[in-house]
């Protein structure tokens, strides 16, 4: 066996070749289009986003149906999956956080700019935000272990994509 970061479900080295779905690709139809592109390209892996606000639409309410569908769709055509976790920040913007976070800047603090005003970005130094993102991410990882541990369709999870 050579050196590799990835192994398939049988422990064999696996070199992922594929495409990354657009960061706004969500839902079964868009994922199917991305899968078709990977297959047309001759790839073996899809990178696709999972958004915090879709995973936790309300505080402490976690919905894994979209994650399950994403795994099922890639597994059905023999592809591997790398999940892109879009949590508290993407390119510095909180586009993918739940509404309860966006609507509560007193708890989930914004970045303070050089002039003392707030910027439209969640502060990476805010413990409340970090704990909520961490909890949602932990729920995702627990689901992945429970749902995909045997088949190992998911190769990796990229944390805080971009």
Question: Where are these predicted regions, by residue range?
Answer:
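Active-site-adjacent "subsite" loops/lids of carbohydrate-active enzymes
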Residues: 67, 88-148
């Amino acid at each position: 066996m050579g050196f590799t970061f990835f192994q398939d479900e049988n422990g064999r080295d696996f070199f992922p070749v594929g495409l990354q779905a657009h960061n706004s690709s969500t839902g079964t139809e868009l994922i199917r289009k991305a899968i078709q592109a990977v297959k047309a390209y001759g790839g073996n892996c899809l990178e696709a986003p999972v958004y915090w606000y879709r995973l936790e639409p309300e505080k402490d309410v976690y919905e894994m149906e979209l994650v399950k569908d994403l795994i099922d769709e890639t597994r059905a055509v023999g592809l591997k999956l790398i999940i892109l976790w879009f949590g508290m920040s993407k390119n510095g913007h909180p586009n993918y956080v739940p509404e309860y976070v966006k609507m509560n800047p007193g708890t989930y603090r914004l970045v303070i700019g050089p002039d003392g005003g707030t910027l439209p970005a969640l502060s990476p130094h805010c413990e409340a935000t970090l704990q909520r993102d961490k909890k949602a991410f932990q729920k995702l990882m627990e689901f992945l272990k429970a749902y995909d541990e045997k088949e190992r369709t998911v190769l990796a999870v990229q944390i805080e994509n971009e």
